[in-house]
């Protein structure tokens, strides 16, 4: 049961359960933790009381503490012994029972926050109170709102850290990916103006890989996302506001990931759902796309497409669609990511 009420009591007070675990504090004090119902039942004589992630003001005028601490209910009694590996072994939330057995790690933070605080508020409106309000609002998102987002998705993951302007999450690789999309959407809606953005790195690791290395390597992916620059059709240049997906050379804008890569992955899954050549085709296609600059790659891809869709009623249409995606550099990058996502989703667990 979650402990969300923390009471500081005098050691000499006898009206609470002495067998209850406690933490000794200086000056003859002790810290006890309760769930809300048990606290109300016991009603200890307190010096001070704190509530975690609750707006409740009826518990002895408690001090509110906000903390991003979402932890999935894995229904595994040995979770404390197995650690994070439990999430790799869990079936992903949106792809039940399928996919590679891997951990996903998400690291993200707000872009250009120093500039926002320095010049984001017009000079004539700048004040200490407005700056403090901006800081508090961002902190509230990463300490309180983040829990609501992950609880709504029931994602198989755990927050390692979330506060200030950044976060670090570990869990089932697929759930981490979908959670990242939800977090970005929620942050955009929370800020309301599109000026504040986040960049992120998403890594995928074996369950036995050292957690410190996961953090470091995913941090490098986050740094790669911070370097993202794209020139738009109207001549404007967009920077950051991006995500590095598994590799530092696979950086996409959030819109590309959610509006191109993810829908394309689902389209690919639909196309190959009843195609026995599906998985083998995908592996070969990814290899050709990664080496598309080689002269022989384009003809080989055309041949592979023709053979793979042989017998399909809409063979010509499918071949044209895949070949057109491969012929454009940005579309090709999105296609590779979608194919990799699909392969990881259908690969045998192990």
Regions found by a protein language model. Give the residues of each.
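Charged, helix-rich terminal subdomains or tails
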Residues: 1-350
């Amino acid at each position: 049961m979650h402990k969300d009420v923390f009471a500081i009591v005098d050691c000499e007070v006898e009206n609470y359960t002495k067998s209850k675990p406690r933490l000794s504090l200086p000056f003859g004090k002790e810290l006890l933790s309760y769930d809300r119902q048990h606290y109300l039942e016991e009603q200890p004589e307190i010096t001070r009381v704190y509530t975690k992630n609750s707006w409740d003001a009826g518990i002895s005028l408690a001090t509110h503490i906000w903390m991003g601490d979402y932890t999935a209910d894995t229904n595994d009694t040995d979770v404390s012994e197995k650690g994070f590996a439990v999430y790799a072994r869990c079936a992903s939330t949106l792809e039940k029972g399928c996919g590679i057995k891997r951990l996903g790690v998400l690291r993200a933070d707000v872009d250009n926050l120093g500039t926002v605080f320095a010049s984001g508020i017009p000079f004539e409106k700048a004040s200490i109170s407005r700056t403090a309000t901006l800081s508090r609002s961002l902190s509230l998102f990463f300490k309180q709102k983040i829990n609501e987002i992950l609880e709504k998705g029931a994602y198989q993951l755990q927050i390692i850290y979330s506060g200030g302007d950044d976060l670090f999450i570990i869990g089932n690789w697929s759930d981490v990916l979908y959670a990242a999309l939800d977090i970005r959407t929620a942050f955009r809606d929370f800020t309301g103006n599109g000026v504040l953005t986040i960049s992120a790195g998403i890594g995928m690791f074996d369950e036995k890989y050292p957690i410190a290395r996961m953090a470091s390597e995913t941090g490098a992916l986050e740094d790669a996302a911070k370097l993202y620059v794209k020139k738009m059709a109207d001549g404007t240049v967009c920077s950051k506001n991006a995500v590095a997906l598994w590799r530092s050379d696979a950086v996409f804008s959030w819109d590309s990931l959610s509006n191109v890569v993810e829908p394309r992955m689902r389209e690919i899954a639909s196309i190959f759902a009843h195609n026995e050549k599906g998985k083998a085709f995908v592996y070969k296609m990814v290899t050709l796309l990664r080496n598309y600059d080689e002269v022989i790659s384009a003809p080989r891809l055309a041949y592979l497409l023709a053979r793979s869709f042989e017998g399909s009623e809409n063979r010509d249409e499918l071949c044209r669609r895949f070949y057109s995606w491969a012929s454009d550099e940005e579309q090709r990058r999105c296609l590779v990511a979608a194919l990799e996502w699909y392969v990881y989703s259908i690969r045998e667990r192990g």
